[in-house]
């Protein structure tokens, strides 16, 4: 399989740099995608992606890792809530928060719920970004299935959602706390002066050089004392190299 040719085509077609991904994992997953649709060569797969919109979206879902749910790993979110209350809200009345690679919006809305529960009626600034325009449109709607909200506490469910049929719809108060925008973690610059950056279960897919660059840029984007919250499989072993200290198992503080 001519993976380099495919990478170049994807970069030109979608402006997505697949060289950032772990090579063996990328190779296996692309072969899996190809086998599912019955094509045997990169050229055939490219032709399919050019003409079949549903397959283009499946490929983009694979690349942008669109798997998410509210309060994923609830006990870790409880730890984050404690840190927000005891550290961030003491120093700043209004917080600036970034949910990076936010997928369907469950993560930034989870953050909005936490902030509203801790400091009601304060207009914290939550920026939620993703590389996938289609998934951002879904996130803006704020409509979810039971499997996506299953970790939401009953008190939050009653207060922040309404149920219509099999849909759970986030209320306008929480929705209005989040601003969604398209952003590429690898290719585009980062905003500054964040109190909290949340990026979970994404960096694990990238090679080490790209990980290093992303963590350095996250550190640069945080205020001193700001927090980086990562996924349950993403411990940063060399966190000191990026200007962090460990605040807890999956939370790092900029020094």
Annotate each language-model stretch with its function.
Residues 2-95:
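Conserved AdoMet
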Residues 80, 197, 222:
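Residue-level signal for inorganic ion chemistry
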Residues 92-105, 124-127:
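Conserved class I S-adenosyl-L-methionine
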Residues 104-119:
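Conserved SAM-binding loop of SAM-dependent methyltransferases across substrates and taxa
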Residues 124-198, 202-210, 235-237, 253-255:
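Extended basic-aromatic, gly/pro-enriched interface segments that bind polyanionic ligands
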Residues 212-224:
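A short glycine-rich, Lys/Arg-flanked "PGG" loop and its adjoining helix->strand segment in the class I
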Residues 225-232:
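Conserved beta-strand signature within the Rossmann-like core of class I S-adenosyl-L-methionine
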Residues 247-251:
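Short hydrophobic/aromatic beta-strand or adjacent loop that forms the aromatic wall/cage
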């Amino acid at each position: 399989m001519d993976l380099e040719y495919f990478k170049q085509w994807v970069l030109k077609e979608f402006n997505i740099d697949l060289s950032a991904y772990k090579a063996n994992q990328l190779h296996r997953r692309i072969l899996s995608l190809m086998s599912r649709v019955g094509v045997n060569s990169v050229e055939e797969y490219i032709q399919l992606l050019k003409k079949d919109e549903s397959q283009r979206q499946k490929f983009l879902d694979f690349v942008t890792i669109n798997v998410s749910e509210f309060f994923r790993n609830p006990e870790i979110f409880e730890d984050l809530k404690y840190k927000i209350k005891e550290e961030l809200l003491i120093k700043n009345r209004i917080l600036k928060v970034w949910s990076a690679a936010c997928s369907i919006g469950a993560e930034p809305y989870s953050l909005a719920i936490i902030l509203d529960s801790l400091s009601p009626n304060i207009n914290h600034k939550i920026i939620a970004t993703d590389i996938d325009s289609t998934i951002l449109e879904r996130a803006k709607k704020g409509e979810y299935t039971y499997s996506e909200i299953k970790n939401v506490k009953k008190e939050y469910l009653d207060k922040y959602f309404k149920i219509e049929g099999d849909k759970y719809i986030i209320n306008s108060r929480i929705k209005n706390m989040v601003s969604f925008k398209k952003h590429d973690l690898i290719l585009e610059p980062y905003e500054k002066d964040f109190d909290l950056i949340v990026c979970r279960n994404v960096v694990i897919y990238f090679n080490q050089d790209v990980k290093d660059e992303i963590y350095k840029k996250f550190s640069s984007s945080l205020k001193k004392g700001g927090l980086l919250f990562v996924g349950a499989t993403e411990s940063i072993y060399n966190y000191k190299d990026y200007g962090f200290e460990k605040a807890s198992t999956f939370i790092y503080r900029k020094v």
